Amino acid sequence: MTQPPGQPVFIRLGPPPDEPNQFVVEGAPRSYPPDVLARLEVDAKEIIGRYPDRRSALLPLLHLVQGEDSYLTPAGLRFCADQLGLTGAEVSAVASFYTMYRRRPTGEYLVGVCTNTLCAVMGGDAIFDRLKEHLGVGHDETTSDGVVTLQHIECNAACDYAPVVMVNWEFFDNQTPESARELVDSLRSDTPKAPTRGAPLCGFRQTSRILAGLPDQRPDEGQGGPGAPTLAGLQVARKNDMQAPPTPGADE
């Protein structure tokens, strides 16, 4: 006997209907003062000159204007469109796709707690909950002093060091709720701890300029080489004289 059809299931696609326009924040600049515009044009010229096709410079240009206001503003989006000969819709489509481009003002330090599967199981959820309680903010919110913006983030490809906390995209490995609390306290007291690896921390706006491809003035000496989990596979391969298979057609 054929069963009667069930009730239809409606699936909502896209953002919730009550979500505000992603790039319209009260007080956000819609144009740059002449001196700021001139400075950004110099930087943009250097960035665009690296690409044979101007529109290929869109991603670094978005980082450039993000470094001006700590998030993407109507002024920044318009600047990118004007520099590259794109429409506002084309720029906004790219900017809204990538989560590294911020849609609201960001603190001096963007603290991201990985809550993807492995980090969550290893303590990432507990770390995020502890920081929410300690800082008095939720996901994508900024402390009242403007120093820390907290967010949960997806995998940072550092699962062998789980749970991982990122500060302005620098790694802090093998964190605990207590060490993460000490980390954000060091940021708010202007005595930031050194990342587990990589360059010393700098502010979010300067980080955005570095991601745009502009000079990085931080010391280039590493703060610790690869850890044991990263090297384990290489050590096993060497011990067993394991070699990568030859590339097909390499001898032809």
From Swiss-Prot:
Broad class of enzyme this protein falls into: translocase
Family assignment from sequence similarity: Belongs to the complex I 24 kDa subunit family.
Gene: nuoE
Listed cofactors: [2Fe-2S] cluster
Region (Disordered): 211-252
Function: NDH-1 shuttles electrons from NADH, via FMN and iron-sulfur (Fe-S) centers, to quinones in the respiratory chain. The immediate electron acceptor for the enzyme in this species is believed to be menaquinone. Couples the redox reaction to proton translocation (for every two electrons transferred, four hydrogen ions are translocated across the cytoplasmic membrane), and thus conserves the redox energy in a proton gradient.
Enzyme Commission number(s) of this protein: 7.1.1.-
Catalysed reactions, semicolon-separated: a quinone + NADH + 5 H(+)(in) = a quinol + NAD(+) + 4 H(+)(out)
Keyword match Cell membrane: no
InterPro entries, A to Z: NuoE-like, NuoE_dom, NuoE_N, Thioredoxin-like_sf
Annotated keywords: 2Fe-2S, Acetylation, Iron, Iron-sulfur, Isopeptide bond, Metal-binding, NAD, Quinone, Translocase, Ubl conjugation
Position(s), cross-link Isoglutamyl lysine isopeptide (Lys-Gln) (interchain with Q-Cter in protein Pup): 45
Name under which the protein is recorded: NADH-quinone oxidoreductase subunit E
PROSITE patterns hit by this protein: COMPLEX1_24K
Organism, scientific name: Mycobacterium tuberculosis (strain ATCC 25618 / H37Rv)
Cofactor note: Binds 1 [2Fe-2S] cluster.
Modified residues (N-acetylthreonine): 2
Residues that bind [2Fe-2S] cluster: 114, 119, 155, 159
